[in-house]
Amino acid sequence: QRQMCIRDRTHLSGHGRNENDAEHAWHMAIMAYLLREYANERVNIERVMIMCLIHDIVEIDAGDTYAYDAEGLKTQKAREEAAKERIFSLLPDDQKKELSALFDEFEANETPESRFAHAMDNLQPLMLNNSNGGGDWREHGVSAKQVYARQNKTKDGSLKLFEVIDEILQKHIRLGNLK
């Protein structure tokens, strides 16, 4: 329930409010399931979906760090590691071990599953930004270079989805939503 109180910087399409972490995680998980055929490699979709659902759970304690916040990114790892230890310690040992391992796998971004989960983490807010006319990028002064730096990592999980992302970004550059 606490995840519903943590607001991301991205606005929900047609709702005039920011998305919360629970919505972000759910959107990612359902997108992963629906888009799994576009993963670069065969993936265990259950593992991907669980990664999607838990990847931001540490923000209950650590708070949300905006993807383009250079200062916040400096302390993000330490804050999130402490939060992970506290939150997962509430679980029975077997579940703590399983979810901690999946969380660490997501963070390391070295397996087909974690790379595809990261692709969903990149794609999902981009889709919301696209649906709100690039408003969040304009509001926060985000440049095309910043978005491409983040989105280039999507290629590791899905080259096909990156092609769609590139088309969306080129459209927003033409429209002046990204400089």
Describe each model-derived feature in a short phrase:
Residues G157-K179:
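Charged phosphate-binding loop/patch that engages nucleotide di/tri-phosphates or the phosphate backbone
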Residues D93-G134, K145-R150:
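Histidine/acidic-rich helix-loop-helix segments that form or flank divalent-metal centers
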Residues E41-I54, E113-A117:
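Alpha-helical scaffolds flanking conserved acidic
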Residues G16, D69-R86, E113-R115, W137-G157:
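Divalent-cation-assisted or electrostatically stabilized phosphate/pyrophosphate-binding catalytic cores
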Residues G16-R47:
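Alpha-helical phosphate/pyrophosphate-handling elements in metalloenzyme active cores
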Residues N44, I50, I57-K96:
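Helix-adjacent hinge/juxtasegments
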Residues I30-Y33, E81-E110, N152-K155, L159, ...:
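Histidine- and acidic-residue-rich, metal-dependent catalytic cores
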Residues R2-C5:
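Short, small-residue-biased leader/transition segments that mark boundaries at the very start
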